[in-house]
């Protein structure tokens, strides 16, 4: 009687087995709603970046930081997708180097990144490092050396056939042996891509700030904003002065 009452309320047939005394009956009678499985399937295929949005079939979540975001369909071609993964990771690493390279000199009072050519070299073009002359050349010479060195390294990397080794070469590039623990390595891959994307956004922010306030660095912009948040903000740039005069 109790089971009939429960079933009339929409409770599945698991309830009678739950009321019985044997665990085997409970396990055997465990039903699964077809509708529930369909719902879970739809949920699992939902893009993580926007709940309810369908996840592209080629973004299966296996790549580090894959949240199903590809609104332009750039990764539909498998070869292109691999190339984009590699390019994103390399640009993320450059951005993570650039952000502290921009912030630290300004924080030390050496100057901002926009005016680096004014404080990173003394008259005559002699390169300096932390204010001290570099004995082996001028800025153009150092830039040429860096260009050739990076070109050589990038050429060597491009010759690698294994797509994973292109992105994670290991060996001398993993002196602390982080890749030896597979589970930890996968976790670090996700952390790297997340921090890299944040650094890419920071670089965009630095460039936008500098274009709006010429010759200023990010820390100077931050200090100006904190001094008067109501007036010194993005609205001060995009909203005409005549609408909201000071």
Swiss-Prot record:
Chlorophyll a 1 binds at residues 69, 88, 197. Chlorophyll b 4 binds at residue 157. It is found in: Plastid, Chloroplast thylakoid membrane. Residues 1-45 form a transit peptide. Keywords: Chlorophyll, Chloroplast, Chromophore, Magnesium, Membrane, Metal-binding, Phosphoprotein, Photosynthesis, Photosystem I, Photosystem II, Plastid, Thylakoid, Transit peptide, Transmembrane, Transmembrane helix. The chain crosses the membrane at residues 94-114, 133-153. GO terms for cellular component: chloroplast thylakoid membrane; photosystem I; photosystem II. Chlorophyll b 2 binds at residues 93, 134. It holds the Pfam family Chloroa_b-bind. Chlorophyll b 3 binds at residue 154. PANTHER family: CHLOROPHYLL A/B BINDING PROTEIN. This is Chlorophyll a-b binding protein 6A, chloroplastic. It comes from Solanum lycopersicum (Tomato). The lineage of its organism: Eukaryota, Viridiplantae, Streptophyta, Embryophyta, Tracheophyta. The gene is CAB6A.
């Amino acid at each position: 009687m109790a089971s009939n009452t429960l079933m009339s309320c929409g409770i599945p047939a698991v309830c009678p087995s739950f009321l019985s005394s044997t665990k085997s009956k409970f396990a055997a009678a465990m039903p699964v709603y077809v509708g529930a499985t369909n719902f879970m399937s739809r949920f699992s295929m939902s893009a993580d970046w926007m709940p309810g949005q369908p996840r592209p079939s080629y973004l299966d979540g296996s790549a580090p930081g894959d949240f199903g975001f590809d609104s332009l369909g750039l990764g539909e071609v498998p070869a292109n997708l691999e190339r984009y993964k590699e390019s994103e990771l390399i640009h993320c690493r450059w951005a993570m180097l650039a952000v502290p390279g921009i912030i630290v000199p300004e924080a030390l009072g050496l100057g901002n990144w926009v005016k680096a050519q004014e404080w990173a070299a003394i008259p005559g073009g002699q390169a300096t490092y932390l204010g001290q002359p570099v004995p082996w050349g001028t800025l153009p010479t150092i830039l040429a050396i860096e260009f050739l060195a990076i070109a050589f390294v990038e050429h060597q990397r491009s010759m690698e056939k294994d797509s994973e080794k292109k992105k994670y070469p290991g060996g001398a590039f993993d002196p602390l042996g982080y890749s030896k623990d597979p589970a930890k390595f996968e976790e670090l891959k996700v952390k790297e891509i997340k921090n890299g994307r944040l650094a890419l956004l920071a670089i965009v922010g630095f460039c936008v700030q500098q274009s709006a306030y010429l010759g200023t660095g990010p820390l100077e912009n931050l200090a100006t904003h904190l001094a008067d948040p109501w007036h010194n903000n993005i609205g001060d740039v995009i909203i005409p002065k005549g609408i909201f005069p000071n």
